Amino acid sequence: MSDYLVKALAYDGMARVYAAVTTETIKEAQRRHDTWSVSSAALGRTMTGTLFLGAMQKEDQKITVKIEGDGPIGPIVADSNAQGQIRGYVTNPHVHFSELNEAGKLDVRRGVGTSGMLSVVKDLGFGENFTGQTPIVSGEIGEDFTYYLATSEQINSSVGVGVLVNPDDTIEAAGGFMLQLLPGATDEIIDEIEKNLTALPTVSRMIEAGETPESILAKLAGGEDKLQILEKIPVSFECNCSKERFGSAIISLGKEEIRSMIEEDHGAEAECHFCRNTYDFSEEELEKLYEEAK
C-alpha cells in the first residue's frame, strides 16, 4: 500500500485530526542511510512528526525540524511541505542497543537523549522564516512534538508516532497520528478524547495489523461516523537536491577554496545529507564555478 496522510475534523468540529501510514517512506530513508534499529526508529518518528507539521502549512511553505539531544544518535533533521513530501537524516545512523526499554520497545530515548532542543523553522515563502524552539522533554519524539505545539504554537495537541523495525534492520511498519483541540472544546469533549487516546493501541502495531489512516482516525474519534474527512495526501520520500544546487554552494565557498579543490584534489565530490546522492565535479567544471565565484 502506498503511504498517505488523512486530515479530518472530529468531536463535532472541536478537534482537527491527522493520521498517516509512512512505512514505505521510512523504508526508503532506512535504505538510503543504512540506519540501525534505534537510529531508524528515531529518524522515522521525527520524519512522521515533521510530516504532520508540513501538512498544517500553506501550499508553498516548508517546515524543517531539528532534534538535538545529548544521546549517541546526534542531531536529527527532517523537512516537509504541504504536499506530503518528506526527507530526513540522522547524524549517527549506526545506533543499536541490545537491551529494550522498560516497555519492551527500542530505547529511542537513550539514543536521542533527554537534554537538548527541538527547533522548527517555517519557510513561509518570500524569504520570510519563523523559528520556534522548545526543550526536549522525553526523547521519545512524539511527546517532544506535543510539547512543542503546546508551548511554541499554543495548540493543545497529542502526537503519536511509531516505527516497527525488523531484526534485520528493515522497516516493518511506520506512521502516526496528531490530534489538535480547537477553540471551544468542552470538558466533556476533552474527557472523551483522553479516554479514546488511552484505549488506542500503539501506532506501529496498528499499522502492522493493517490499519489505515482512516481506521486509526475512527478509533481516535470514537467511531467512523464521528469523522469529517477533509483531505487525503500521498506521502513519499522526496529530495530536491541537484548538481546545480551543489554548484551554487561551491561558488559560495569563494575563489580560494575552489582553487584548492582544483589544484590539490583535482575535482570534488558533494554528497547530499538528506538522500546520500553524490555529485562529482571535474576540474573543468570547477574552473567554470571559479570564474563565477567572488
UniProtKB/Swiss-Prot annotation:
The keyword Cytoplasm applies. Its main location: cytoplasm. Keywords: Chaperone, Cytoplasm, Disulfide bond, Redox-active center, Zinc. The keyword Chaperone applies. GO terms for cellular component: cytoplasm. GO terms for molecular function: protein folding chaperone; unfolded protein binding. GO terms for biological process: protein refolding. It holds the Pfam family HSP33. Under oxidizing conditions two disulfide bonds are formed involving the reactive cysteines. Under reducing conditions zinc is bound to the reactive cysteines and the protein is inactive. It comes from the Bacteria. It is found in: Cytoplasm. Disulfide bonds join 239-241, 272-275. Signal peptide: none annotated. Belongs to the HSP33 family. Redox regulated molecular chaperone. Protects both thermally unfolding and oxidatively damaged proteins from irreversible aggregation. Plays an important role in the bacterial defense system toward oxidative stress. This is 33 kDa chaperonin. It comes from Listeria monocytogenes serotype 4a (strain HCC23).
